[in-house]
Amino acid sequence: MLFYEFFRSSIGSRVSVMLKAGVYVSGRLGGIDPYLNLSLLDVRILSSHPGLSSISVCSIRGSSIKYILVDKDAKLLQGVNAGSRLRMILDKCY
């Protein structure tokens, strides 16, 4: 749930998504669910896929995502680091 909370707090910001199929997509994050399924608005396809050039809105299944790039936000990064450390400490205690 750590990454879900991170991306949920990034709704409305620009993200770039690399899919396992090799498609590179950029857009504004419109929504996300706990399975990391994404909804993107104002979509631009950054790789050479001519059939996808006219898409403006898309939904991406979480299991097809290779990685996601977001703008660096120091406050969010500190929250993710703190959450990761806390989870590691709790796992060692139990």
Swiss-Prot record:
UniProtKB keywords = mRNA processing, mRNA splicing, Nucleus, Ribonucleoprotein, RNA-binding, Spliceosome
InterPro entries (UniProt xref):
LSM_dom_sf, Sm, Sm_dom_euk/arc, U6_snRNA_Lsm2
Subcellular localization is given as: Nucleus
Record's keyword annotation contains RNA-binding: yes
- Describe the location of the Sm domain by residue ranges: 2-74
One of its GO biological process terms is: mRNA splicing, via spliceosome
Superkingdom of origin organism = Eukaryota
What Gene Ontology molecular-function terms does this entry list? RNA binding
Q: Which GO terms describe its cellular component?
A: catalytic step 2 spliceosome; Lsm1-7-Pat1 complex; P-body; precatalytic spliceosome; U4/U6 x U5 tri-snRNP complex; U6 snRNP
* Record-linked Pfam families: LSM (PF01423)
Oligomeric state and interaction partners are given as: LSm subunits form a heteromer with a doughnut shape.
Q: Name the protein family.
A: Belongs to the snRNP Sm proteins family.
General function of this protein: Component of LSm protein complexes, which are involved in RNA processing and may function in a chaperone-like manner. LSM2 binds specifically to the 3'-terminal U-tract of U6 snRNA. Required for processing of pre-tRNAs, pre-rRNAs and U3 snoRNA.
Q: What is this protein called?
A: Probable U6 snRNA-associated Sm-like protein LSm2
Q: Which organism is it from?
A: Encephalitozoon cuniculi (strain GB-M1) (Microsporidian parasite)
